[in-house]
Structure formats: C-alpha cells, structure tokens
Amino acid sequence: MSNGDCPFCQISRGEMDTEFVYEEEDLVAFEDLDPKAPVHVLVIPREHITAVTDVPQDLLKQLINATQTVAEQQGVAESGYAVRINNGADAGQEVEHLHIHVVGGRELGMP
C-alpha cells in the first residue's frame, strides 16, 4: 500500500471527513469507525509507518504519551482503559499504518 492509498495517511492529511480528538505535529487521534467500546480512539503517526518495530524511539514516546492524554480527555483514565497495538496480519492489523487503540468506557476482557 502506498502512502497515497493509505486511509490513515489520508486522515492525517485532512483528506477524509474525520474529526481529530487530539493532535500534535507528528500524530493525530480520532474515533475508531467501528468502535468496540464506548471509547475507542486510534492514535497514529502522521508519517506512514507500518510496524511498531520501525518507529523511532522519540516518536514512540510521543505516541504513548498521547494515549495517556486521550484517555484523560475521554474520561477513562481513572476507571481504566486498554492500549493495544496490532503488529502484522497475524495480530489482526487491518490497516498497514501503525495505530494504537485506546479503548475504555466499560469493563474490558482479554484479548
């Protein structure tokens, strides 16, 4: 998938009708289109990065910090929330652009 075809790249460039719940220079966060809980936000780098193993350490730190900020803004930081990265097809990664799920608002189980 090229950057031009990547839906998350299109979202991060503002080419799709998606409202950001949080954004910084290098990342954006928006509500999942198919939420699995009352709060289900995706945090993505603006740069097209496919796998978590390819993320520079400074950007990874920004992404993790953003998950905390999103959880606080969405009101789930105190009650609890899950942070999940699906890395590769076997893990369930459906879009080949790194994204971190922030999920909460109800009791969650595994996986």
Protein language model regions, located:
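HIT superfamily nucleotide-processing domains
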Residues: 1-111
